[in-house]
Amino acid sequence: MKHLLKLLNPSLLLPIVSLLLVSASCKKDDPTPPTPHNDEEVITTFQFKITDSASNATTTYFFKDPDGDGGQSPFYGPTASTQSDSVLQLQNNRTYFVQVILMDETKSPATITSDEVNAEGQDHMLFYNNGSTTIISASNPYTVKLNGSDMVIKYTDLDSGSPQRGIGLTTRWRTYTTGKYPLNITLRHQPGVKDGTYAPGDSDISVNFKYQIN
């Protein structure tokens, strides 16, 4: 490099040095590509924990699709891994505290996906429906009535949005009419469009149970 600099006209060195400095500056200032963020929740297990407010007894029911999009067949519980459906057993004129736990069991240890849903509650909402559902209150606490059984479901959690809205991971159920009824629970992913209604966004998971009020 010393010999090269001697041969060059000094008047030519300044543009060359400037070019080298600009090139180095551009390399230094080149932004690092951002790491892609995966917003899709992986859910292989939907679990209900139902606590009778009178007896304080808790019963767990679940739906599992062990390998997600793989070839294993999904199943219900709690009694056996071969159940084709699950019936939630409830007593009439009772109040129940209900918690939904969502998991990704393709990982070891399993990931509690409902923790992520709760943390991003302003983008998520669980909807409970039996084919004919009436919204009793769209404000807090968000409350619906499942027509036919007249069971009332009141949301007991709130997101961090403004205004705050229910998420549906924890709810309080009140039973009124005996019989056996269908129940669909759908988790809607509604980033930036959550308004307390089902329509906006996409479904992360939708599971069908039945409930028996005795």
Where are these regions (language model features)?
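Bacterial Sec-dependent N-terminal signal peptides
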Residues: 1-5, 18-48
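Extended, polar beta-sheet/loop recognition surfaces of beta-rich domains
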Residues: 29-31, 35-41, 106-163
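A composition-driven surface/loop motif
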Residues: 41-59, 177-183, 187-191
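N-terminal edge beta-strand
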Residues: 63-90
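Exposed beta-sheet edge/beta-hairpin loop segments within beta-rich domains
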Residues: 86-94, 153-183, 190-202
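Gly/Thr-rich phosphate-binding loop signature of adenosyl cofactor/nucleotide-binding cores
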Residues: 100
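Short acidic/polar inter-strand loop motif in beta-rich domains
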Residues: 104-112, 190-196
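Short beta-strand elements
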Residues: 199-214
